């Protein structure tokens, strides 16, 4: 199916709505473990392109914060906007560049996803660290970064690496 601009805008809107609604299924505690808002953003980048993935990634946590009150705008929604913006950008850009290189589509998915996850989490950690420097009451340590980015979130990372390639390949 030839993807038109209207299709990409429509699908991006649908994925944005999904990013706002999916966290209701997990609740707050399980949401930080399963990262349900991340899946629609990664899909948006891969399917619609890096421009849409970047935009929807930035908008989704901020819009959800305004509409629902969760995540809190500061520091969580702001740092998540950077993280998810990077997710959408990197997943879309790498998928676009690698899919025509005679590589297995599954391999392209994994390279795009893992790169986006690593860079997005680094962006999240950097923003949280800078916020901690500015706001001395919100200090963000390296152990807090490792815990929040990888240790607590590993089930969500694994779920993304399983669910997204299945959806892309099917």
Task: Give the residues covered by each predicted segment.
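Loop-helix junctions at membrane interfaces
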Residues: 1-170
């Amino acid at each position: 199916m030839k993807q038109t601009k209207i299709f990409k805008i429509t699908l991006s809107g649908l994925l944005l709505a999904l990013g706002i609604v999916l966290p209701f299924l997990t609740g707050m505690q399980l949401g930080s473990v399963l990262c349900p808002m991340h899946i629609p953003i990664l899909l948006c980048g891969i399917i619609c392109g890096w421009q849409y993935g970047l935009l929807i990634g930035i908008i989704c946590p901020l819009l959800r914060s305004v509409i629902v009150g969760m995540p809190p705008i500061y520091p969580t929604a702001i740092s998540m906007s950077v993280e998810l913006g990077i997710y959408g950008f990197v997943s879309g850009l790498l998928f676009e560049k690698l899919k025509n290189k005679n590589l297995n589509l599954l391999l392209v998915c994994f390279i795009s996803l893992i790169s986006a996850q690593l860079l997005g989490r680094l962006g999240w950690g950097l923003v949280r660290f800078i916020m901690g420097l500015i706001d001395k009451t919100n200090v963000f340590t390296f152990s807090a970064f490792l815990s929040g980015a990888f240790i607590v979130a590993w089930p969500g990372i694994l779920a993304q690496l399983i669910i997204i390639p299945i959806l892309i390949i099917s």
